[in-house]
């Protein structure tokens, strides 16, 4: 550890900071045709068992067992000018969350024991009217969320149970106009609604129970752009504007280093432009590039500044090359500086990252062999990663990995 990280490394060793995860998941997808149209359905289930040791005593030993399941069914059809799809979905998440004292790596007394449930019901419809030169799309989604908490510990026999229902409509509308066979312009408008997750709600700075001061986010915005596609070149240019109320942001508290808490941050605005392009070089391969330039700002109780954790600009360049059984991928990524805190006092420097990956396939008698080499951070750039916005004790980031090599071998008989 360097000087900046030495104190935290000592705490990590003292409290035996670590985590382990066991997970299973399964799912099924069914499709069939009816007189009304094509029906698509899916169902899924996963279970996640998590144990984490954080570098503090009170609640620093975490056990979480999560059941997550859901299903969706929709039907779609199209005629000469119309396309439509309607559907419904359900999701259910149940978290058995326990926290104990972390007595220097050993499980101590229980500090939190609660069952958290989040059930969502959704219904949606999307219709598109298509003509030769233009297309109009419109959609509407309705969501109903039921959130509950059962406290199993009860401090001084005071059990903190919780139940709440939230609902929202999310409309959207868009227009695409074809200038000619290869060029088109478009404009979209939409509204969205995002409830806090169970993990965000359960991170209550006041102790057990949910953080009832945490509200859902509401966003509205539009984007307008131009797309072109020719034989060798395709590109798109877009401008966007998003207005969000009650932005959810993370922060940390003294004595709970490494644990995330969440709060609402007034209003925020995202205004910017994006450029994406792809060029077919022929035998030399394909070049892909993307660039984003934007402003991400917030205002909260008369205080304004830049949103933490988001760079104002970034650029990516990628080269793909293939010849017979050989494949090569090189990429270059530039990320501008960003603020690590809402006060805009700590700035994380910009960096330039490069990677290269090569692989070759061999068809040998009786079996197939693929050998690959991936070099990450090819130029050995020193930069910071794992950004923790609004962290306590200046623990905003960690040094990222320097140049590393990954050798892979895959075979099939």
Indicate residue ranges for each PLM-predicted region.
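Single conserved hydrophobic/aromatic residue that forms the stacking wall/gate
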Residues: 1-10
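C-terminal beta-signal and adjacent terminal beta-strands/loops
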Residues: 193, 243-245, 287, 337-339, ...
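Transmembrane beta-strands of outer-membrane beta-barrel proteins
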Residues: 39-43, 84-88, 136-140, 171, ...
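Gram-negative outer-membrane beta-barrel transporters
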Residues: 78-81, 129-132, 145, 239-243, ...
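Face-selective signature of the C-terminal outer-membrane beta-barrel domain
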Residues: 19-154, 228, 233-241, 286-288
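Residues on the lipid-exposed face of transmembrane beta-strands in outer-membrane beta-barrel proteins
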Residues: 26-32, 71-77, 123-129, 140, ...
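Outer membrane beta-barrel strand-and-loop segments of large Gram-negative receptors
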Residues: 64-76, 118-124, 211-215, 221, ...
């Amino acid at each position: 550890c360097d000087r900046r990280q030495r104190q935290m490394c000592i705490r990590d060793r003292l409290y035996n900071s670590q985590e382990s995860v066991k997970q299973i998941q399964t799912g099924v997808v069914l499709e069939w045709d009816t007189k009304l149209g094509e029906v698509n359905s899916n169902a899924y289930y996963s279970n996640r068992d998590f144990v984490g040791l954080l570098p503090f005593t009170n609640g620093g030993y975490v056990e979480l067992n999560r059941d997550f399941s859901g299903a969706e069914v929709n039907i779609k059809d199209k005629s000469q000018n119309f396309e439509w799809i309607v559907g419904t979905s359900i999701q259910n998440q149940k978290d058995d969350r326990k926290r104990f004292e972390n007595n220097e790596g050993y499980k101590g007394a229980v500090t939190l024991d609660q069952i958290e449930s989040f059930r969502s019901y959704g219904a949606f419809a999307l219709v598109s009217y298509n003509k030769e030169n233009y297309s109009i799309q419109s959609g509407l989604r309705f969501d109903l969320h039921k959130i509950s908490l059962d406290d199993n510990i009860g401090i001084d026999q005071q059990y903190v149970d919780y139940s709440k229902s939230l609902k929202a409509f999310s409309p959207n509308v868009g227009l695409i106009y074809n200038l000619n066979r290869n060029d088109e312009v478009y404009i979209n408008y939409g509204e969205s609604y995002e409830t806090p997750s169970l993990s965000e709600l359960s991170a209550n700075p006041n102790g057990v129970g949910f953080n009832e001061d945490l509200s859902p986010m509401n966003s509205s915005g539009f984007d307008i752009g131009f797309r072109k596609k020719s034989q060798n070149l395709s590109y798109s240019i877009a401008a966007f504007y998003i207005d969000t109320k009650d932005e959810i942001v993370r922060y940390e508290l003294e004595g709970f280093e490494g644990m995330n808490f969440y709060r609402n941050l007034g209003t925020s605005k995202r205004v910017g432009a994006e450029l994406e392009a792809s060029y077919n070089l022929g035998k030399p391969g394909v070049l892909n590039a993307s660039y984003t330039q934007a402003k991400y700002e917030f205002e909260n109780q008369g205080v304004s500044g830049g949103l933490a954790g988001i760079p104002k600009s970034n650029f990516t360049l990628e080269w793909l090359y293939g010849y017979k059984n050989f494949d090569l991928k090189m990429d270059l990524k530039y990320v501008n500086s960003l603020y690590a805190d809402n006060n805009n006092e700590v700035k994380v420097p910009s960096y330039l990252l490069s990677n290269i990956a090569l692989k070759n396939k061999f068809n040998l008698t009786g079996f197939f062999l693929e050998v690959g080499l991936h070099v990450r951070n090819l130029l050995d750039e020193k930069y910071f990663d794992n950004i923790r916005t609004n962290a306590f004790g200046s623990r905003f980031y960690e040094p990222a990995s320097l140049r590393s090599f990954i050798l892979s071998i895959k075979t099939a008989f």
